[in-house]
């Protein structure tokens, strides 16, 4: 529960709010009472120097017994109150008809809670600090009240050449700046709005400002350049917005922001939007905001993601990620837009290139020119391709409507990054899906992520071949329905001829070819996900055999039944069911077919499976994020319990998956053991290792990754290398440490 504060008596500029302090104390008490009764009231937390917005509470989620109480802005504001849905209708908010019309034309008929909570105090001239979850409509929260007041002030000023801006919006990234510009332009096309940022022509932006402007949106670096060059005058700025203020700190803009704020008129209205409140943001608000009202729609909630985002986590081997990625997109995106987040520029390029053979995709990262970057984003927005593979440069401020799927190809560097990556879907109240890929050694990291973010993953397996085929067919059918009728006329003759010859098989063949399955799909291992491999399950009934059931027992069994299978067996895992002795293992498809036709010893069952049972998990785990997660391990350490392999099974070396840190070349999570690190023959046991025939068999024990535990440093040839963190903690909001190192967790 938000703590209640003693509110000082405040002189309101609005005569209708003269007795506001008394009513605000009553609002605070009613909020406390509603929380006691179990109401999910969004927190509007007041600092000692701010006013608690009773109106924000009432408009969000108060009960019917409060409907007739007079709010701090007078009973006139509440006249005709009929409930949340009707009260959030923009047509009932007293906005200019022109603004209402443009919003409705864009399909915006109701406000979201953060927009409604901000509207009244913003129109009253209050300085604001607002917190809300990613994707909840913060841009229009400050945009609507500013546009309303600019429209009402307009006396022909918006057409005057050379006019200086009345609104300044600062954003940490060019993508966010462009998104804010787009929202304001589409909502108020008659206002002159200019977006300025680095990486593009300075002269073009100078010329745009010289023609006259009402709203300037930009990144701090380019804003300062234009101020120093005399192209941008801030003397008439009435409204300042700091959007995603906490990220100004993360990207190193704190000095630039303070320099800009010192250039602004003292009598302006300021609004600060920030997901977290690190110490720098608090200092900024104390120094540059006037008695700000804090509207907090996050409060102490553990859940940092917007509602409607379904979270999945999928365990994979490092070398199987690219194989499975296209199948995940096919099944879970359902033909919609997907953003795949990688850790490095190299990965983004390589993953995009690998996907292009089956799915149209483009890469987006820091080495791409601004011109190409804008072409790529526009193409993605327009649906010219459906998959964008991006580094975290795109996670902040990238606002693309109707993104259906987010895939974390690599673990994020910290929980904050996970939230903002995932927040690219499920925006504006829509549903979305986010899938986290991880290796077995990173399972503890995934659990830590659940704890830090306050979310819960549904653990899934890779889609089956049948699921991929079914989804592919649905996508192709949807595409065929979009073909223009005039185009089909040219192919009717050929279609009729084929139908006469082949019947329904003609259409089936066309669907298969368009889906990318001109040839039958090969089988795929459920363990390593390699094409051409099959996963079998061996089950032994109680009372049969002697000794402990182990991978060695499985290789002994295979040696007795089929020597070729024993020579080629891949990964072997023991099942977790305590009541049944069993194991799963991989074999090449042809050998598996032969093995399934052979007779097995009594009490044993051998089957081909389409879904993995629960397995024993004895692999070591890390508890670190992203690049600080060490999955390289010790080559001298043998795997414990659950997994062993023989022959060519197991993990392959991917020499391409390297990254550099501290001047040294290291392997990333995509590294694995080479066959040189493991001998297929292994060592012979001095005792019988198989209970299926008393024969001594040998197996190879693979080296198991032995990660280093620690977020800050990893061993680099005996030397310690640490990376400083300049951002803000996701848990407490203070700078200088990550959530995993937070002393307050």
From Swiss-Prot:
One of its GO terms (cellular component) is chloroplast. Residues 606-724 are annotated as: Disordered. Its main location: plastid. It is an enzyme of class 3 (hydrolase). GO terms for molecular function: ATP binding; ATP hydrolysis activity; RNA binding; RNA helicase activity; zinc ion binding. A motif (Q motif) lies at residues 88-116. GO terms for biological process: chloroplast organization; Group II intron splicing; ribosome biogenesis. Residues 119-295 form the Helicase ATP-binding domain. Residues 687-724 have a biased composition (Low complexity). Its EC number is 3.6.4.13. PROSITE patterns: HELICASE_ATP_BIND_1, HELICASE_CTER, Q_MOTIF, ZF_CCHC. ATP binds at residues 132-139. Residues 324-469 form the Helicase C-terminal domain. SMART domains: DEXDc, HELICc, ZnF_C2HC. Residues 656-670 have a biased composition (Basic and acidic residues). A zinc finger (CCHC-type) spans 727-744. It catalyses: ATP + H2O = ADP + phosphate + H(+). Keywords: ATP-binding, Chloroplast, Helicase, Hydrolase, Metal-binding, Nucleotide-binding, Plastid, Ribosome biogenesis, RNA-binding, Transit peptide, Zinc, Zinc-finger. Residues 641-650 have a biased composition (Gly residues). It is found in: Plastid, Chloroplast. PANTHER family: ATP-DEPENDENT RNA HELICASE DBPA, ATP-DEPENDENT RNA HELICASE RHLE-RELATED. The Q motif is unique to and characteristic of the DEAD box family of RNA helicases and controls ATP binding and hydrolysis. Belongs to the DEAD box helicase family. DDX21/DDX50 subfamily. Nuclear genome-encoded factor involved in ribosome biogenesis in chloroplasts. Binds specific group II introns in chloroplasts and facilitates their splicing. Required for normal development of chloroplasts. This is DEAD-box ATP-dependent RNA helicase 3A, chloroplastic. It comes from Zea mays (Maize). The gene is RH3A.
């Amino acid at each position: 529960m938000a703590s209640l504060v003693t509110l000082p008596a405040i002189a309101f500029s609005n005569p209708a709010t003269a007795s506001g302090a008394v009513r605000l104390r009553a609002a605070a008490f009613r909020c406390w009472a509603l929380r006691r009764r179990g109401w999910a009231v969004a927190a509007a937390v007041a600092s000692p120097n701010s006013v608690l917005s009773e109106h924000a509470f009432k408009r969000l989620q108060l009960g019917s017994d409060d409907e007739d109480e007079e709010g701090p802005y007078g009973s006139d504001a509440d006249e005709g109150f009929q409930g949340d849905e009707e009260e959030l209708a923009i047509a009932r908010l007293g906005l200019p008809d022109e603004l209402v019309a443009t919003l409705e034309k864009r399909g915006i008929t109701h406000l979201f809670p953060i927009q409604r909570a901000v509207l009244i105090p913003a129109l009253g001239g209050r300085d604001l600090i607002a917190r809300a979850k990613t994707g909840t409509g913060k841009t229009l929260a400050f945009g609507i009240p500013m546009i309303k007041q600019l429209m009402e002030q307009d006396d022909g000023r918006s057409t005057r050449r050379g006019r200086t801006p009345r609104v300044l919006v600062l954003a940490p990234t060019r993508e966010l700046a462009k998104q804010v510009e787009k929202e304001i332009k589409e909502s108020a096309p008659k206002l002159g709005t200019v977006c300025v940022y680095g990486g593009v022509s300075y002269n073009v932006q100078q010329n745009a400002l010289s023609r006259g402007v009402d709203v300037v949106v930009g990144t701090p670096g380019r804003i300062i350049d234009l101020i120093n060059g005399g192209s941008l005058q801030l003397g008439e700025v009435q409204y300042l917005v700091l959007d995603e203020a906490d990220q100004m700190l993360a990207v190193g803009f704190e000095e630039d922001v303070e320099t800009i704020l010192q250039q602004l008129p003292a009598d302006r209205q300021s609004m600060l939007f920030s997901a977290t409140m690190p110490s720098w943001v608090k200092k900024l608000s104390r120094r540059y905001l006037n008695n700000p009202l804090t509207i907090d729609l996050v409060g102490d909630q553990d859940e940092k993601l917007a509602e409607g985002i379904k979270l999945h986590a999928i365990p994979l081997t490092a070398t199987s990620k690219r194989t499975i990625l296209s199948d995940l997109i096919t099944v879970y995106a359902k033909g919609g837009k997907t953003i795949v987040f990688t850790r490095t520029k190299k990965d983004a390029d390589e993953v995009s290139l690998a996907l292009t053979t089956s799915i149209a995709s483009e890469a987006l990262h820091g080495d791409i020119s601004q011109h190409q970057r804008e072409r790529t984003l526009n193409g993605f927005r327009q649906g010219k391709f459906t998959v964008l593979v991006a580094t975290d440069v795109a996670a902040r401020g990238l606002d693309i409507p109707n993104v259906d799927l987010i895939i974390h190809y690599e673990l994020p560097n910290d929980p904050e990054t996970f939230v903002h990556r995932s927040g690219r879907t499920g925006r504006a109240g829509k549903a979305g899906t986010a899938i986290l890929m991880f290796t077995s050694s990173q399972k503890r990291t995934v659990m830590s992520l659940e704890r830090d973010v306050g979310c819960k993953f549904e653990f899934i397996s890779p889609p089956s071949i049948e699921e991929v085929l079914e989804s592919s067919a649905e996508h192709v059918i949807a595409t065929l329905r979009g073909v223009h009728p005039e185009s089909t006329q040219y192919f009717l003759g050929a279609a009729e001829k084929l139908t006469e010859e082949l019947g329904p098989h003609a259409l089936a063949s066309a669907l298969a070819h368009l889906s990318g399955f001109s040839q039958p799909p090969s089988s795929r291992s459920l363990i390593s996900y390699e094409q051409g491999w099959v996963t079998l399950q061996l089950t032994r009934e109680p009372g049969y055999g002697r000794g402990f059931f182990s991978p060695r027992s499985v290789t002994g069994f295979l040696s007795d039944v089929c020597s070729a299978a024993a020579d080629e067996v891949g990964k072997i895992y023991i099942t977790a069911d305590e009541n049944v002795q069993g194991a799963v293992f991989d074999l090449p498809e042809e050998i598996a077919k032969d093995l399934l036709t052979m007779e097995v010893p009594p009490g044993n069952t051998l089957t081909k499976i389409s879904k993995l049972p629960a397995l024993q998990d004895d692999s070591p785990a890390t508890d670190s994020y992203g690049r600080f997660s060490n999955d390289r391990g010790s080559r001298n350490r043998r795997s414990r319990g659950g997994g062993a392999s023989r022959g060519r099974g197991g993990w392959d070396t991917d020499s391409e998956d390297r990254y550099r840190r501290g001047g040294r070349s290291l392997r990333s999570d995509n590294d694995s053991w080479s066959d040189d690190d493991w001998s297929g023959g292994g060592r012979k046991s001095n005792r019988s290792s198989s209970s299926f025939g008393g024969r001594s068999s040998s197996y190879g024990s693979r080296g198991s990754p032995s990660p280093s535990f620690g977020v800050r440093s990893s061993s680099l040839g005996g030397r310690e290398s640490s990376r400083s963190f300049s951002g803000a903690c996701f848990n407490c909001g203070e700078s200088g440490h990550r959530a995993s190192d937070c002393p307050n967790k």
